[in-house]
Amino acid sequence: MQVATTGLVLRQVKVGEADRILTILTPDLGVVSASARGSLRMKSALFSATGLFCYSEFTLTSGRSHYFVDAAQVKKVFHGISASIEGMALASYMAEIAAELSPAPPEADAQLRLLLNCLYMISERHYPCAQLKAIYELRALTLAGYI
């Protein structure tokens, strides 16, 4: 069964010579694991769309235990995040929190929007990282129902 959805790549793990396993936060499926075959090859159509912190349009096929990425189209890449170590560390921390909270589909949309807004703020350096960290933690825990 094929599913078309948007999503943010939270985590990527290299598997084999040219494959990656991605953890993707989607608004309608929640947090999913997907295998992107050949995505590490420079000439692959999946190369740029499956990068870390890439917001993309995915076409996924469901497998037994996880999904497979059939196609992906980049919607937004947060290039400014990698400009500083502090920004990269904060973005990784936020992605880890989002993956651990594993929101169900109704709440996943709000978590995704919050994370995308925070990644944009880190990328454009609108606020100090310490302030963004506090804002994200408070809002993410509130959306998850802990506060």
Q: Where are the predicted features?
A:
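Non-catalytic alpha-helical scaffolds and adjoining flexible linkers that form interface surfaces
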Residues: 1-147
